[in-house]
């Protein structure tokens, strides 16, 4: 993408406030044209002094122009600042909404921290360009087009000096653009590496400290910063050289104008005031050319990060599901996989030609070794991924023919990783159903065996749980995740190793609750305990992405195949969790209401 196209696309993000943008730009253009009158008025003042004529009228007009210019500039700058900040936050929010709606594979390919880095840096760069566009760029371009004809009208011989100066600025800018293009792209790459390392180290701070990796991680960061500086310095050198050359050219131009002006004054072909006016024109033009040079510098330095952002934006639009898709309604829970295949990009892993049928209210246990495709199967049902071949239907309706939002309303999932937000316990559970009452939420927590431990917290349901639930134990996190799914009360329940982090006693209590809520509800369970598999209506045995065996527990045992060998090898936990009945002093629900 060329520099001009990059710049033009940045400006398209102002379209939603087109009228306000045009008003500010128009006012700034008028201001730029008015500014041109100042050197002319100054020249008249000088002539009035030299000729000893009345100076007060001209001086008064000049002062009024100056005051009006200052006031107008303040008002325009205020309007531009407010508009840019509004658009910056709006673009950030709109892009964020599209990014978090993208399929999981999209995030896995790009990296969550990388997408965040691209978004934040690009939005900041766009805000700077918008502000400069409304304050300077457009008015500078207009001023240059107006300045040159006026200058030629005043004195064509002196104007040639200004034209030569403008050509020199353009040539220097083109040279620097050509010399720094690849270097700036490399700088952006090193920026990503640096940000990725910082994000990776901080997110794994417990490992860094546990393995005494602080010095090593800091050393790696130093290496990234050194690489960044090595790439950045040549780019900075070229722009420093350009700045020096521009300054030299402008100084020589002013000297030439003064020398030529003095020559023409001595010959009586110009008045002193006209020379002074022309010097003012020259200085005004130099300031505008400097602004154009800074604009080119800014756009070039931002081009790489903006192009990454545009590529990311384009991918979100391409992956956006069609509008006006119907909703999945009145779900009963009959599910069919029809020859479903999904292969991960750049990998041989996935699931292949999977077909099975689940009747309404049945419980399905998915069994298999690590990497067999169990979680992938569940993710396809939720449309986190979409099948490469085949299709999945719920109640006879292809799930790709309905919108994702309605599909996911029909599913309640408890992941192996609890997936908690840095918010209160109440907020984390209410994600299941934001319209639920406090009483419904507390009841869901009781069913998930979470209510008792929550009441022991200082702020009870208003307790902040930290990033990724860092203030909770593994079992507590899992119980909140289960409570969230219970509260959602969806017709299809998915348990991805939902009790893996629970102790035996708590697991027994939660298992009873899950058995209760899964009654007459289609349930998928990634199973590791024999008791879960034995009680399932349908057992699916997966291996290397293939459905090797399916049937009831007794059918697969009688078959004596891979599932039977798995049992004999002890790969499924045989123990049945039990619970001892004991009296507990449970705090009443009404006492849990936050003050």
UniProtKB/Swiss-Prot annotation:
Pfam families: ABC_membrane, ABC_tran. One of its GO terms (cellular component) is plasma membrane. It is found in: Cell inner membrane. Its EC number is 7.5.2.3. Residues 21-301 form the ABC transmembrane type-1 domain. It is a multi-pass membrane protein. It catalyses: [(1->2)-beta-D-glucosyl](n)(in) + ATP + H2O = [(1->2)-beta-D-glucosyl](n)(out) + ADP + phosphate + H(+). GO terms for molecular function: ABC-type beta-glucan transporter activity; ABC-type oligopeptide transporter activity; ATP binding; ATP hydrolysis activity. CDD domains: ABC_6TM_NdvA_beta-glucan_exporter_like (cd18562). Its main location: membrane. ATP binds at residues 368-375. Signal peptide: none annotated. Keywords: ATP-binding, Cell inner membrane, Cell membrane, Membrane, Nucleotide-binding, Sugar transport, Translocase, Transmembrane, Transmembrane helix, Transport. The chain crosses the membrane at residues 22-42, 55-75, 129-149, 152-172, 248-268. PANTHER family: ATP-BINDING CASSETTE SUB-FAMILY B MEMBER 10, MITOCHONDRIAL (PTHR43394:SF1), ATP-DEPENDENT PERMEASE MDL1, MITOCHONDRIAL (PTHR43394). In NdvA the ATP-binding domain (NBD) and the transmembrane domain (TMD) are fused. Belongs to the ABC transporter superfamily. Beta-(1-->2)glucan exporter (TC 3.A.1.108.1) family. Homodimer. Involved in beta-(1-->2)glucan export. Transmembrane domains (TMD) form a pore in the inner membrane and the ATP-binding domain (NBD) is responsible for energy generation. This is Beta-(1-->2)glucan export ATP-binding/permease protein NdvA. The gene is ndvA.
